[in-house]
UniProtKB/Swiss-Prot annotation:
PANTHER family: 54S RIBOSOMAL PROTEIN L1, MITOCHONDRIAL, LARGE RIBOSOMAL SUBUNIT PROTEIN UL1M. The keyword Repeat does not apply. Signal peptide: none annotated. One of its GO terms (biological process) is translation. HAMAP family: Ribosomal_uL1_B. It comes from the Bacteria. It comes from Verminephrobacter eiseniae (strain EF01-2). This is Large ribosomal subunit protein uL1.
């Protein structure tokens, strides 16, 4: 485990780990702790009231953050013919079929998101062992296997984030950058929470949004009172 810097230790002393902060107060602390020379990501961890080991309690989806992520997203699309042209017109960075598959097999993957038209899955399906571990395998549940490749490209470029609860029932996601004003970060978090609520499994019982914490890339975590978030 990496050692904390003097600034991180000082910030830890300012954060009461037993307290639930209002979102705006938590954001002040998180931004104060984001002292790196680059524009740190503001991230959220949400503990859900699910049993992630049960197949009927899998939480997975995607949402376009209304204020973007602050990151340039590079998009690759597996498509041919008219669909390939639609993807290019929408701003895809790389479009192809067998030629794109060859790039992937060679380890040449200059992209962050992979989208596929349904008829391209015969090619994409052979790349599962490469794309899967990198979190790049297209999936209809998050809208990356779709006949509307143009819309998928536009969503990815506009700041769409994919989310999935891990084995502990925790969802990790970015909601923007330190340079974002508080209103934009709050708007992005509200969109994420709304998407999580919409994907709540019917078999999930009790409180669904159990815990929430904010942090920056290099900063400390701050627990947030979920009641302080307006969706």
């Amino acid at each position: 485990m990496p050692q904390l810097t003097k600034k991180q230790k000082a910030m830890q002393g300012k954060v009461d780990s037993t307290r639930l902060y209002a979102f705006t107060d938590a954001l002040v602390l998180v931004k104060q702790a984001a002292t790196a020379k680059f524009d740190e990501s503001i991230d959220v961890a949400v503990q859900l009231g699910i049993d992630a080991k049960k197949s009927d309690q899998v939480v997975r989806g995607a949402v376009v953050l209304p204020n973007g992520t602050g990151k340039i997203t590079r998009v690759a699309v597996f498509a041919q013919g008219a669909k390939a042209e639609e993807a290019k017109a929408a701003g895809a960075d790389v479009v192809g079929m067998d030629d794109l598959a060859a790039m992937v097999k060679a380890g040449d993957m200059p992209f962050d998101v992979v989208i596929a038209a349904p008829d391209a899955m015969r090619v994409v399906g052979t790349l599962g062992q490469i794309l899967g571990p990198r979190g790049l395998m297209p999936n209809p549940k998050v809208g990356t296997v779709t006949p509307d490749v143009a819309l998928a490209v536009k969503n990815a470029k506009a700041g769409q984030v994919q989310f999935r609860a891990n084995k502990a029932g925790i969802v990790h996601s970015t909601i923007g950058r330190r340079s974002f004003d508080d209103a934009k970060l709050q708007g992005n978090l509200a969109a994420l929470i709304d998407a999580l609520n919409k994907t709540k499994p019917a078999s999930s019982k009790g409180q669904y949004l159990r815990k929430l914490a904010l942090s920056s890339t290099m900063g400390v975590g701050v627990r947030v009172d979920t009641q302080s978030i307006t969706v």
